[in-house]
Regions:
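Pepsin/retropepsin-fold aspartyl endopeptidases
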Residues: 1-130
């Protein structure tokens, strides 16, 4: 699948006057979205906890995780999503968790985000209870 970017506004959920806009790489292989820590700190987003992650090259890394408001321009919607405080030179990545929160998938032919229907539960959720 070809790589592409989407414009995203990141906003401090506790102070909506503090935000920035950036082009993010859409990365379905990344569980979480990544933003360079100085950008998140610059708008006052605070870490909530630490997460151990496996990076694309196989290394393990401990990173801070917080929450921010994400507005994906082409969707015109705003939702709270988890975000990893990346290194200063980190790429801006829009990960699978954010994509699922917004109810979208990637259309590789058009390099656009497309709406999907959410699945609630599975086999056990569909069984009658006696």
């Amino acid at each position: 699948m070809g790589m592409f970017k989407v414009a995203v506004e990141i906003t401090n959920p506790n102070d909506r006057a503090r935000s920035f806009r950036e082009d993010f790489w859409v990365d379905t292989g990344a569980l979480y979205s990544f933003v360079p820590a100085p950008r998140l700190e610059g708008i006052g987003v605070e870490p909530l906890r630490s997460r151990e992650l496996i990076l694309a090259d196989g290394r393990r890394d401990q990173r801070l995780l917080g929450e921010a408001l994400f507005t994906i321009d082409e969707l015109g919607e705003t939702l709270t999503c988890p975000v990893i405080f990346g290194p200063s030179d980190s790429l801006y990545l829009l990960g699978a968790t954010a994509l699922e929160n917004f109810g979208v998938d990637v259309d590789p032919a058009t390099k656009k985000l497309k709406p999907i229907l959410g699945v609630i539960g599975g086999f056990l959720a569909s069984r009658e209870q006696f």
